[in-house]
Amino acid sequence: MGEFSTLLQQGNAWFFIPSAILLGVLHGLEPGHSKTMMAAFIIAIKGTIKQAVMLGLAATLSHTAVVWLIALGGMYVSRAFTAESVEPWLQLVSAIIILSTAFWMFWRTWKGERDGLANRLPAHTHHHHDHEHHHHDHDHDHHHDHQHVHISLKGLTDGSHAWQDAHERAHATDIQRRFHDREVTNGQILLFGLTGGLIPCPAAITVLLICIQLKAFTLGATMVLCFSIGLALTLVAVGVGAAISVQQAAKRWSGFNTLARKAPYFSSILIGLVGLYMGMHGYLGIIR
């Protein structure tokens, strides 16, 4: 770090701005940074590109905020204060929130399937009863109460191949209803993203502290910002890639909706395992 300090004092800081962005990109590719959890979360909720961008930016925002809090707080609290000393506590807090999110995803999927099944069964039975004898009454009576069945069977004729697939179409409509972004609010997405970025980056904290000690506060802030931009590019790319993959799979693979009904279970289990690992790692770091 001595050479780095010398270069800063010589006025060669402009060279480090693009380098900081590149390092942020590479740093985001390292293990961790919640890339696995973000991708699993986007796949589980069948998220849009907009939601993926929001998730990545939220993770970057919290990651940057933690760097500033630790660097500035450490200067005033104790000279022996380091990123390594506070990291286990942040990991433990993150693990608790992540495990709660995994449990919420699992419970939400199970409840959605149970409620969807309860709503579909009487609707299907009544529909088959009235379709043949009271076609006009069906349009009038069920427009409000069983809209999801009306949509899924729209334009079907008795005996057609589409009619035989009506049950599968009803399932597809139910998937779209359950995983529409109205059920997963922007606040929940932001909370998950903010949680994923709580783990601090010792390298970024060290650079910021050096800049502050050299009375180059503006430069330090700029470099941390550039580092965060690079990190955001990686995290957003991961989320957008997951969102596009979900959309393309839904268009090109007829069996995707069947898999999508079970995907949230696997995603919540995967997120839960990551949370457990993070919690154990944080706990072991605390007791050492």
Swiss-Prot record:
It is found in: Cell inner membrane. Residues 125-137 have a biased composition (Basic residues). It is a multi-pass membrane protein. One of its GO terms (cellular component) is plasma membrane. Its main location: membrane. The keyword Thylakoid does not apply. Keywords: Cell inner membrane, Cell membrane, Cobalt, Cobalt transport, Ion transport, Membrane, Nickel, Nickel transport, Transmembrane, Transmembrane helix, Transport. Residues 1-12, 73-85, 210-223, 288 are periplasmic. Residues 125-144 are annotated as: Disordered. One of its GO terms (molecular function) is nickel cation transmembrane transporter activity. The chain crosses the membrane at residues 13-33, 52-72, 86-106, 189-209, 224-244, 267-287. The keyword Lipoprotein does not apply. Efflux system for nickel and cobalt. This is Nickel/cobalt efflux system RcnA.
